[in-house]
């Protein structure tokens, strides 16, 4: 579960390392976001000479959460960190690589490009 002020790691090769959630998209009263939801982030740490700079505001999709997610078959899946992938205006990933595993729930959220870039789908 991600809410405003939550820090996330950026799991792509755009150059951003750490991000902070500043808005959960999907309604004015919406408080929490889960895997596959789109949020607005601000980049807090970035490597030099990268496509995103510190202070950039952009949209991102959540690919991993430390809070467990219940699946239809009764199993739970959780990860070690909260992570996101930066999106462009067309809601496709801005980077060309995705680091670490991603959850299978991204397929249901129609983020097939992110799933295809990931090395492992759990």
UniProtKB/Swiss-Prot annotation:
SUPFAM superfamilies: Ribosomal protein L14 (SSF50193). GO terms for molecular function: large ribosomal subunit rRNA binding; structural constituent of ribosome. Keywords: Ribonucleoprotein, Ribosomal protein, RNA-binding, rRNA-binding. One of its GO terms (cellular component) is cytosolic large ribosomal subunit. The keyword RNA-binding applies. InterPro entries: Ribosomal_uL14, Ribosomal_uL14_bac-type, Ribosomal_uL14_CS, Ribosomal_uL14_sf. One of its GO terms (biological process) is translation. HAMAP family: Ribosomal_uL14. Part of the 50S ribosomal subunit. Forms a cluster with proteins L3 and L19. In the 70S ribosome, L14 and L19 interact and together make contacts with the 16S rRNA in bridges B5 and B8. Binds to 23S rRNA. Forms part of two intersubunit bridges in the 70S ribosome. Belongs to the universal ribosomal protein uL14 family. This is Large ribosomal subunit protein uL14. It comes from Borrelia garinii subsp. bavariensis (strain ATCC BAA-2496 / DSM 23469 / PBi) (Borreliella bavariensis).
